[in-house]
Structures are given as C-alpha cells and as structure tokens.
Amino acid sequence: MTTAIQYQVIPLADREHSNKVASILENKYKTATNKRITLNERFGVLEKGYTIQATEPETVKNDSDVFFVVHDRNLNSKKEFVENYLAKNPIVNSPEKVFEEEDKENAPTKKAVLKPSSTDEKKLTSSDIYIQEITRSILQSV
C-alpha cells in the first residue's frame, strides 16, 4: 500500500493575486505525489502570494486483498460454511497420497506419490486451489 500526498494552493489574504500564477500553481500541485515539497518550493510559492497545505493522504490499495464473505445466513458458524463448501466442492487434486512401503531392510517407510489424474475429474485453477487451501486452514484453526 502506498500513500500519496495531495497539496492545496491557498491565496494569502494581504497579497495581490494573478489568475495566471494561480492556475500554474494549481496545475503543478493538484495531482497526488509521493514526493515531498522542499523549503525552496514553499518559499517560491510564498513569494508569489500563495501558500501550500497538504490535504489528507490518499491510500492506494493493491488488488491483492482477500475477502471471505458468507452469503448463506441460515448457517450458525463459519465452520459450518467451510464444511458445506468442502462438501459441495471436493478436493479433486490432493497434492500427495502417502502410503507405506517396505524397503530393502524391511523397515516401514512412507513415500509420497502424486495421485494420477483421470479425464473425468474436474480441472481446478490456481484460484480454486488457493480458496480450498484457505478453507482448510480456517477449518484447522476452528
């Protein structure tokens, strides 16, 4: 998130004002900027009969925020919502299936093998997988 400061040009009460100078200053300082104004710039504006004031900084948001919205109001808790979501959207591509296999010394070991995908299974996009991982983490915390 970045913040940009917008400046407002205000005429001083006891000075003469020129519309040309006012329009030049307003065009220069009307857009929000991350750059701070130096003292030399402030004194230059004061000599022309104006002053500069910073307005409230605008907040520029990135689109990476994640929102969790429950539309069904008949549910009692978020846990029920997540359970219903996982029931309706089963996790098709579980990343690894773990099974036990004996090695050369007959000691049980666990190996991770990817589950083969069939043609009738639903294809998941990265956003679907991301949502399912979020719901899993919420369920584990509840």
Curated annotation (Swiss-Prot):
This is Protein tost-1. One of its GO terms (biological process) is cell division. Component of the tost-1 variant of the PETISCO complex (also called the pid-3, erh-2, tofu-6, and ife-3 small RNA complex) containing at least tost-1, tofu-6, ife-3, pid-3, and erh-2, which plays an essential role in embryogenesis. Within the complex interacts with erh-2. Within the complex interacts with pid-3 and tofu-6. In contrast to the pid-1 variant of the PETISCO complex, the tost-1 variant of the PETISCO complex plays a minor role in the biogenesis of a class of 21 nucleotide PIWI-interacting RNAs (piRNAs) that possess a uracil residue at the 5'-end (also called 21U-RNAs). Changing R42C: May abolish the interaction with erh-2. Expressed in the germline. GO terms for cellular component: cytoplasm; nucleus; perinuclear region of cytoplasm; RNA cap binding complex. Component of the tost-1 variant of the PETISCO complex which plays an essential role in embryogenesis. Within the complex acts as an adapter which binds to the complex via erh-2. Does not seem to play a role in the biogenesis of a class of 21 nucleotide PIWI-interacting RNAs (piRNAs) that possess a uracil residue at the 5'-end (also called 21U-RNAs). May inhibit 21U-RNA accumulation. Required for chromosome segregation and cell division in early embryos. The record marks R42 as: May be required for interaction with erh-2. It is found in: Cytoplasm; Nucleus. The keyword Protease does not apply. Residues 97-123 are annotated as: Disordered. Its main location: cytoplasm. Keywords: Cell cycle, Cell division, Chromosome partition, Cytoplasm, Nucleus. Disruption phenotype: RNAi-mediated knockdown results in embryonic lethality. RNAi-mediated knockdown results in chromosome segregation and cell division defects in early embryos. RNAi-mediated knockdown enhances the activity of the PIWI-interacting RNA (piRNA) silencing pathway. RNAi-mediated knockdown disrupts the localization of tofu-6 to the perinuclear region of the germline. RNAi-mediated knockdown results in larger tofu-6-, erh-2- and pid-3-expressing foci. The keyword Cytoplasm applies.
